[in-house]
């Protein structure tokens, strides 16, 4: 992305100093421009120091939250067997791209701003520009893949059953990274370190012509913003409609009766029957083996003794005791879709100002520079980088099973030392077994003895 504000918005390399800078470029620079010295801004030292302190604090907070949060996501999704689903595979790729944005881009954007010059050389300049573009492209395409996967799983379950596997998700993720890598090749080709004044270097995009720069900006705006936005809006709109109709017209009893009629009429075991659909025919509840239906959680198979124990101890459902299984699955899907919608909305809110600024600068560089230089462009950059740290917060606040997986992972990494039980004194009576212990003893005895 044309986003690297490397030594662009600070007033200069010294108190009250004028900075010779190109008139054309704004975000990283993409045209040659004419060097002109701007008059120093008349601001107090206290205001300048406060702005610098706020900027450093915000950058540091976003950087730490992005690194810690996305590393936590990668570890939890990698270690938890219950979270190894198709949707979470794309969320894992999204976390890797956000981590790449934080580690490979943020330090090399902040430090040149503080120092007033770019000191890292041409190789780092090209690499930072390339990795930033790849990260944004992978994030966008991953969100599109998640939307299409959820649409297929919820609205087209029979067709999704054929290809909705983790191996297929892995192939899509690899294709996403390869496509993003190829799409962003122009960035390292047309990025270089250029002098912007006396002892001032800048990492800039230098396109062959203004027409090519405008074409590139419009192309990115269409491929990575408008088209993905329309696809995701349509997909989640259809998903919301399907879930709303499923919750409104819940026909478990109708489908059970239809399954019985179908089995009596020669269907093998009533295969493929599930909850009734509002259009009058039964809809199959097809999903991955072991998945509970929300797309972000896998129900691991339990051993036979555990199943027997759950059957013995499970309370008998009565009227009004809670939602039925099919309705509970729909509610779980609805919660996951709501979380994914929040992720999509936050992503586009964070990157909309950057796309708008880049397009404005491509067609009206001087006007964009006058309007956005200084605090506005600093806020735009901070907002775009904040997109790398919002997803972990969304997962923790809106994904109960992810929170539980985080706690389980922390408990596994930092186990508590076992507490020693106090031994009874010789004159004390032995402890009376609790009801739970008696239940386990009785169950073990029954299971061991077997029938008659």
Swiss-Prot record:
Name of the featured protein: Gastrin/cholecystokinin type B receptor
CC per GO annotation: plasma membrane
Residues covered by region (Disordered): 256-285
Keywords: Cell membrane, Disulfide bond, G-protein coupled receptor, Glycoprotein, Lipoprotein, Membrane, Palmitate, Receptor, Transducer, Transmembrane, Transmembrane helix
Glycosylated position list: 7, 28, 34
Stretches of the chain found on the membrane's Extracellular side: 1-57, 121-127, 193-218, 361-376
Single Gene Ontology BP annotation: cellular response to hormone stimulus
